[in-house]
């Protein structure tokens, strides 16, 4: 185990636990799969593969722009890790001055969620440096560096339902219980994808495909270049399965944490000794439900089925051990019970696209709007200005017919620490969806979309962008930006 502390480049403190020993897999050779005819399920303008935060935003945005959209999702819900993964703590949507910069589709979600499905500071306190308010909200994952931020926790079931209703309202063809397999390639461009379901293998043909799988499954299988290096001293490469305990009194727990630091430290030390893998409880949207977003496990690959299975098993065992320890030692947890382990494993990193451009650590201090800015993300600390997200980070270096959005966009490993978060996935998803629709309408490849038109359409959909000088006319290929 190693402990990660908060610095100017990370938000949450936490422990990282190393993997168990991996058993070698026997090499048993290969079988030949004969060729076959595959039924065409649907033709469409835009196929979005993956219904997580970025894919949901992409589908809704493309449909709002007038495209015929199909959204393919392997689970029975939308929202991905923000719902099925129980990542219900939504990272900062305001900058360090309290300005809301994660807007557009994300803002629509929070405008439409019921008030009892969201917990967080009121707008009047966003950006506050009042010590009492910062202390209050820091225990509720909504204040960092002594500044109150809009970092709410949400009811995952309500977000599932709302996400589903929004895409249906927009006319998106929603396809659940379907797992994308291989991209369809025509003349060097992506022209759709095959997928598996209870009906067997079928195909969807599309003019533009948006890879919102989170792991770059489609662009990797289509031959696009990608990176998979990690930052060992951060949590961005770890995996775990989150869970919820109910029957708790989180106010008693927060009083214990806030007023008895020695007791809390002793509690955590005892938990590590008793459980091995150990995690502190986080607030949720309700006082009687506790969220556990760890323990974070290092050294596993999100692209290895044996590793994914091992993380699930370790996490489920950790949940049982935590329940016993918390019941005996944690104020407010005497009557706790298991209510849910996440249906989706918490993957933070697998692949990152090598794009025309990238979100780069070297630009953090610049504070200027890039010519092809499609979104703005809050910086990691008050030492840095807001960070510009370029359209080129969604566009593969060479591959046509496809855009990427979500945690696998083009960025370096430092920037991935925040670009993988839920709000940033909403930003890049909305940008990819609008760009895909504009590409179809103009009859051009996504890399040739007119940036002025793209930015105007994003502004019309409520996205926060900044004035910039000399917008590029398109995102053209250049030297690799993401090593």
Regions found by a protein language model. Name each.
Residues 2-18, 126-153, 157-161, 169, ...:
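Mobile, glycine/GP-rich and aromatic-enriched active-site lid/loop segments adjacent to catalytic centers
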Residues 2-27, 35, 67-68, 74-182:
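Conserved N-terminal/central alpha/beta ligand/cofactor-binding core
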Residues 38-52:
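Beta1/beta-strand and adjacent pyrophosphate-binding region of the FAD-binding site
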Residues 42-44, 199-208:
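Core beta-strand elements of the Rossmann-like FAD/NAD(P) dinucleotide-binding domain
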Residues 49, 204-215:
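Short hydrophobic core segments
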Residues 184-203:
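Conserved beta-strand-loop-beta-strand element in the redox core of flavoprotein oxidoreductases
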Residues 211-226:
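Flavin (primarily FAD) binding-site architecture
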Residues 427-443:
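Internal hydrophobic alpha-helix adjacent to the cofactor/substrate pocket in enzyme cavities
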């Amino acid at each position: 185990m190693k402990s990660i502390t908060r610095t100017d480049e990370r938000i949450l403190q936490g422990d990282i636990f190393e993997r168990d020993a991996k058993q070698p897999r026997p090499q048993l050779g290969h079988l030949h799969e004969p060729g076959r005819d595959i039924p065409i399920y649907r033709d469409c303008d835009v196929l979005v593969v993956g219904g997580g935060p970025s894919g949901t935003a992409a589908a809704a945005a493309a449909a709002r722009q007038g495209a015929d959209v199909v959204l393919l999702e392997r689970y029975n819900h939308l929202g991905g890790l923000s719902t099925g993964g129980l990542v219900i703590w939504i990272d900062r949507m305001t900058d360090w001055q309290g300005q809301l910069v994660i807007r557009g589709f994300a803002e629509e979600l929070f405008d439409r969620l019921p008030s009892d499905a969201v917990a967080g500071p009121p707008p009047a306190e966003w950006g506050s440096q009042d010590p009492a308010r910062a202390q209050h909200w820091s225990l509720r994952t909504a204040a960092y560096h002594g500044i109150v931020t809009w970092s709410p926790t949400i009811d995952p079931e309500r977000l599932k339902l709302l996400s589903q209703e929004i895409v249906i309202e927009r006319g998106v063809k929603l396809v659940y219980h379907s797992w994308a397999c291989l991209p369809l390639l025509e003349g060097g461009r992506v022209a759709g994808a095959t997928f598996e379901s209870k009906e067997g293998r079928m195909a969807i043909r599309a003019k533009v495909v948006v890879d919102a799988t989170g792991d770059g499954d489609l662009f990797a299988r289509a031959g696009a270049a990608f990176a998979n290096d990690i930052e060992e001293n951060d949590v961005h490469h770890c995996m775990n399965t989150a869970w919820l305990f109910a029957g708790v009194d989180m106010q008693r727990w927060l009083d214990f944490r806030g007023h008895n630091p020695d007791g809390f430290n002793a509690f955590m030390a005892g938990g590590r000794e008793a459980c091995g893998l150990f995690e502190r409880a986080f607030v949720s949207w309700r006082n009687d439900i506790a969220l556990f977003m760890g323990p974070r496990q290092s050294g596993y690959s999100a692209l290895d089925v044996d590793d994914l299975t091992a993380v699930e098993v370790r996490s489920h065992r950790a949940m049982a051990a935590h329940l016993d320890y918390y019941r005996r030692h944690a104020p407010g947890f005497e009557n706790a019970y298991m209510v849910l382990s996440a249906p989706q494993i918490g993957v933070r990193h697998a692949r990152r696209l090598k794009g025309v451009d990238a979100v780069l650590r070297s630009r953090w201090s610049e504070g200027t709007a890039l010519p092809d800015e499609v979104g703005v993300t809050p910086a990691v600390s008050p030492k840095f200005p807001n960070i510009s997200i370029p359209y080129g980070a969604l566009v593969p270096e060479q591959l046509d017919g496809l855009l990427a959005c979500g945690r696998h966009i083009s960025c370096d490993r430092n920037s991935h620490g925040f670009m993988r978060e839920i709000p940033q996935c909403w930003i890049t998803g909305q940008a990819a969806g609008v760009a895909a629709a504009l590409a179809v309408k103009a009859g051009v490849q996504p890399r040739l979309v007119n940036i002025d038109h793209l930015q105007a359409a994003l502004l019309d959909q409520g996205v926060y962008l900044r004035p910039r000088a000399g917008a590029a006319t398109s995102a053209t290929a250049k030297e690799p930006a993401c090593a």
